[in-house]
Regions:
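Acidic surface patches and DE-rich sequence motifs
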Residues: 14, 62, 122
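Short, solvent-exposed secondary-structure boundary motifs
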Residues: 1-5, 48, 107-111
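Conserved structural core of kinase catalytic domains
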Residues: 18, 25-27, 37-42, 48-96
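ATP-binding glycine-rich loop module of kinase domains
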Residues: 1-42
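Conserved kinase catalytic-core segment
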Residues: 89-112, 116-119
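Catalytic activation segment of kinase domains across protein kinase-like and atypical kinase folds
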Residues: 110-160
Length: 161
């Protein structure tokens, strides 16, 4: 499953059949700073309410300092789901993604990365954001490009939809 996940080059991913762990090697703080960073991130993620509730942040201690990491259950990435889901299900998922996107934009003046690999579905069908980052608001520039890309990519839509 880890091979189906997209990632930054500086992020190391480890997974088994139940959990995924992401090591954020671009961050290497002193232990105290790492814990502060994690506390702030946990609080922000709680407020945003777009991340899986079982996602946990932690610090791995090394000789160089504290490496920030997180762990969460394995979810089905949306770009994989799109390969087999029918168009009605896809429309529901895209609607949920847009709700998340516009809620974050309106409330926090930030944007999500709308790439399908940044979203995943739990076993109840609920969508969660996987990217650990939110991005500066860009007046819908990325949104337009993302929607165009999605429409071209999703060959699930037929003439009856």
């Amino acid at each position: 499953m880890a091979s189906a996940l997209q990632r930054r080059p500086s992020t190391r991913i480890f997974a088994n059949k139940n959990y995924i762990v992401k090591l954020k090697s671009e961050f290497n703080f002193k232990t105290v700073e790492a814990r502060r960073w994690i506390s702030k991130t946990i609080e922000q993620e709680r407020i945003y309410n777009i991340y899986h509730p079982a996602k946990k942040w932690f610090v791995i201690l090394s000789d160089e300092g504290g490496i920030i990491a997180n762990m969460m259950p394995i979810l089905e990435p949306l770009h994989i789901t799109c390969e087999t889901a029918n168009s009605d299900v896809l429309i529901d998922y895209l609607s949920s993604i847009n709700e998340h996107y516009f809620s974050i934009a309106k409330q926090y003046d930030k944007r999500l990365d709308l790439g399908l690999s940044n979203f995943a579905i739990d076993n109840t069908g609920k969508i969660f954001y996987l990217d650990d980052d939110l991005y500066q608001w860009d007046d819908f520039t990325a949104f337009g490009a993302s929607v165009s890309h999605l429409l071209l990519k999703l060959n699930q839509f037929d003439e009856d939809t």
